Amino acid sequence: VFVQMVLCRNGEIWDNSYLYFLINFENKKVLVRVDFNVPLDKKTYEVTDDTRIRAALPTIKKILKDGGSMVLMSHLGRPLKKLKDDGSIDVEKFTLHHILSKLSELLGQEVMFANNCIGEEVVDQAKSLQAGQVLLVENTRFHKGEEKGDPEFAEELAKLGEIYINDAFGTAHRAHASTTIVAQSFDQDHKAFGYL
């Protein structure tokens, strides 16, 4: 169970953000769970409210400033509950690629995109990241293992980073693979909450 506001160490209560001073992000690949579940225009799929994206910027910029690279993961909507007539996922409607241009604009730099969130191809993309680069992976809810809290799916996600940061406070109460379960793959010195 995560505690968002405070953490205790050696009998002292610290503000959660203090953990940032204990983690060295330099030349590290950081897996960050963000909450980019934002509203989109029903016709153009453009972001109509970027509040949640803006809320993640302090954490993202902190890691980049400290010399890290990062893989961002999020869900968008409920794709497995709103399947197409043929039973397939409506990728066009629920892809996180819709977030890419707005995120790049707000961050002031190019953000790369991976067409999946697990698998050899995305692992290779993550490994090739240089300091200061950002990779956004595809919607975690395209996989059943996400909402089921599947440990095997979480282990696949964990391959994308050396450090795990949960910056998705709005979803932290759910025992999903990309929030609670994936954190179990990282020791205490390699995981923390973001500024949210």
Stretch-by-stretch model annotation:
Residues 2-196:
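Active-site loop-to-helix "anion-binding N-cap" substructures in soluble metabolic enzymes
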